[in-house]
Amino acid sequence: MSTPIDNIPFFKGLPIPSLMTIMNVTKTLQIEKGKNLFSQGDEADGLYVLLSGKMQVYIFSGHVGGTTKVLADLEPGQFVGEFGLIDGDKRSASVRITEAGEVLFLPAIAFAVVMDNQPVVAQAVCDYLCEKVSGLPRITWTSPNAKLIHEKNVKPSLSNMKTLCKIMREHNKQTAVLQKG
């Protein structure tokens, strides 16, 4: 049995009942060409999986009214908002709809309830984040806490997941600055 969330890395390998629980709290939304799904600086409200159509992820470079830098063109099956789903931080990029279609929306509030009630989901998300963080270049794994991350031995709490997301966001910002300069 396949679901639209099977392609999301931190949901891979979850048992079917857990996937179905997550799917039960999602909503399908129509998206219109030329509109933004969300904008850089908006409050994060959840994760979006592109079911049909196309979207473009971009950031504003420099001052208001300045140019934009395209980070990615998204096709059906791809997703945005995974960090915001967990940490609730403001959106770090904007997403423009370039071809009308549909997205599957997973609200952050509903997902938090799923994680509270399904430890297997919380563990899968935490393991995925540990894997992402441990794969970052230029990070030294010498402290006891860093070793826990590297060994995926982190308690799957929302607080720990937010910390892992923060590390990823900081790394992404530093990478963007290095690419700019």
Locations of the language-model features?
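Regulatory nucleotide-sensing modules
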Residues: 5-61
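A small-molecule sensor/coupling module
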Residues: 18-21, 90-92, 109-160, 164
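Short aromatic/basic micro-patch
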Residues: 47, 73, 105
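Short beta-strand His + acidic residue motifs that chelate non-heme Fe in jelly-roll/DSBH
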Residues: 57-58, 82-83, 93-97, 113-114
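Short acidic-glycine-tyrosine-enriched beta hairpin
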Residues: 63-80
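A short hydrophobic beta-strand segment most commonly corresponding to one strand
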Residues: 101-106, 110
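Intrinsically disordered, low-complexity charged/polar segments
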Residues: 157-181
